[in-house]
């Protein structure tokens, strides 16, 4: 004997599957329609559109695949070189079918992408390893710094082109009874300043022979015709 409550539960349990089945039946044709519809040719962005193939590309598409299978270790650049040499050996009658196919592909490409323009990509120029020494010299000149190296020390702070006195160093000589002697060292030619093009028009002051501190001033005779001072009287 069937209970009335059980029939109600059975009727309630059958209602949700009927609703889901109806929803799946309504969405099924839409999914099948969207999956089977082909993409329109004009939906691809122009940046990703490739150029139409020319006659050589149409001919070499099959030849390249065949040559790559015969020579798997051959580089792609070598394959292109050989295909180009073979294409030049063909006569006009052998090239005609590929030329016609290239014209057909170009017409279809123009119809599908009327706003297409070929924009070749430029290769980025590789920067140098570092700035040259000439560039550093020009930068120092513009900033007012010296053109020579940092090891050069000038004695004239105003110009930096004054005479550099020779450096004296005391060295112990064996057999000299413990006496120290002064050893004169000539300045190296690398330490001399270079010519500055900004100061070519200026006259640099003349310098006499260098005298160490404490040495007497050399006697300079007076000019002819000038009266001598009577300081000895």
Swiss-Prot record:
Residues 1-48, 113-153, 208-233 are annotated as: Disordered. InterPro entries: HMG_box_dom, HMG_box_dom_sf, SRY-related_HMG-box_TF-like. Residues 1-47 are annotated as: Required to promote HAND1 transcriptional activator activity. GO terms for biological process: brain development; cell differentiation; chromatin organization; male gonad development; myoblast development; negative regulation of striated muscle tissue development; negative regulation of transcription by RNA polymerase II; neuron differentiation. SMART domains: HMG. Residues 138-183 are annotated as: Interaction with FHL3. Residues 18-27 have a biased composition (Low complexity). The keyword Transcription applies. The modification Phosphoserine is found at residue 37. Widely expressed in fetal and adult tissues examined, highest level found in fetal spinal cord and adult brain and testis. Residues 49-117 bind DNA. CDD domains: HMG-box_SoxA_SoxB_SoxG. It is found in: Nucleus. This is Transcription factor SOX-15.
